């Protein structure tokens, strides 16, 4: 099952995962990696081996893996993210289905700069790039090894590197209907530590035909181990759940999806306190994202 949602990068689930609904021009599905947490999703594309992917989203805040990333949840700065990426089919099975892929994208965040953001370009506060090698040994099973570099063009944060292993099960059975996914990440440059994420994303069609809207109910549990969130932070955990409404459209010859998503982050005491003083220390944080994703 190809998922029809894209997660908001700061919400640690549905961002990262990009997905676009099927359309008359869609000929195959390729895997895709989220820049924030390295989770896998599927995205419908056209024929051929090279597939550009573009997305734009607007959010009420920027949170990464349950913790404040740059912007608190509110309408103070309203960050905008532009992601450019793609997938290349390297190998096909005897039936023509893609089995080995190179995938990647660069997600770039922009907002109204704060007084402390003095390095030009002041508004460009993050640039997260991930590249991976994905393998589909059988239909409905996708694995990937990926490497991400997360930088701050305006110098507000230090550059970090991460290595990840990721898995997605999307076969046409009862378990595949839940679209379970898991990723394990080790930070190779920065604070260090290990991060694990486990999520599901059951999806429901709200009509008949390929142009029908869909409703997805994502749910995730993420754990940062060994001071992943901050030096001395220990092991921290959060959960995320909500809903994503997506409608397939045609834009410039691309298979596209317009999406609206609402998530609730639920953090443990140690994780929520890490947000002070720049963000809320509430246990529950509401996040909303509107996005457009296009794939060729």
Roles of regions detected by a PLM:
Residues 24-114:
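Short glycine/proline- and aromatic-enriched beta-strand/turn motifs that initiate or cap beta-hairpins
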Residues 40-51, 89-101, 121-123, 136-142, ...:
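Short loop/turn motifs that connect adjacent beta-strands in outer-membrane beta-barrel proteins
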Residues 217, 241-296:
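Predominantly the C-terminal beta-signal and adjacent terminal strand-loop region
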Residues 64-72, 112-122, 156-162, 192-197, ...:
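Outer-membrane beta-barrel translocator domains and adjoining extracellular loop/strand segments
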Residues 56-62, 100-110, 114-116, 131, ...:
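Transmembrane beta-strand segments that form the barrel wall of outer-membrane beta-barrel proteins
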Residues 86-92, 133-135, 149, 167-171, ...:
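Residue-level signature of outer-membrane beta-barrel architecture
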Residues 11-21:
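Bacterial N-terminal signal peptides
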Residues 48-50, 76-84, 123-129, 157-163, ...:
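Residues that define the transmembrane beta-barrel architecture of outer-membrane proteins
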């Amino acid at each position: 099952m190809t998922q029809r949602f894209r997660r908001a990068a700061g919400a640690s689930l549905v961002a990262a995962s990009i997905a676009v609904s099927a359309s008359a021009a869609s000929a195959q599905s390729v895997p895709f990696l989220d820049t924030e947490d390295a989770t896998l999703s599927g995205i419908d594309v056209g024929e051929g081996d090279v597939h550009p992917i573009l997305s734009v989203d607007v959010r009420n805040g920027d949170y990464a893996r349950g913790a404040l990333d740059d912007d608190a949840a509110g309408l103070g700065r309203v960050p905008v993210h532009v992601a450019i990426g793609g997938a290349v089919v390297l190998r096909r099975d005897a039936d023509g289905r893609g089995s080995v892929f190179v995938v990647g994208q660069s997600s770039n965040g922009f907002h109204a700069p704060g007084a402390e953001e003095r390095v030009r370009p002041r508004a460009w506060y993050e640039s997260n790039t991930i590249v991976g090698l994905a393998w589909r040994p059988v239909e409905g099973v996708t694995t990937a090894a990926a490497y991400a570099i997360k930088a701050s063009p305006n110098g507000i944060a230090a550059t970090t590197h991460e290595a990840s292993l990721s898995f997605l099960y999307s076969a046409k059975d009862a378990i595949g209907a839940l679209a379970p996914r898991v990723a394990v990440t080790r930070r190779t440059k920065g604070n260090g530590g290990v991060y694990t994420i486990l999520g599901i994303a059951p999806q429901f069609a709200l009509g008949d035909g390929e142009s029908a809207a869909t409703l997805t109910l994502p749910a995730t549990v993420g754990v940062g181990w060994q001071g992943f969130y901050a030096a001395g932070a220990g092991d921290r955990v959060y959960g995320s759940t909500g809903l994503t409404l997506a409608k397939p459209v045609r834009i410039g010859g691309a298979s596209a999806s317009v999406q609206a998503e609402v998530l609730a982050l639920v953090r443990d005491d140690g994780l929520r306190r890490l947000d002070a003083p720049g963000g809320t220390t509430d246990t529950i944080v509401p996040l909303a994202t509107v996005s457009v994703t296009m794939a060729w």
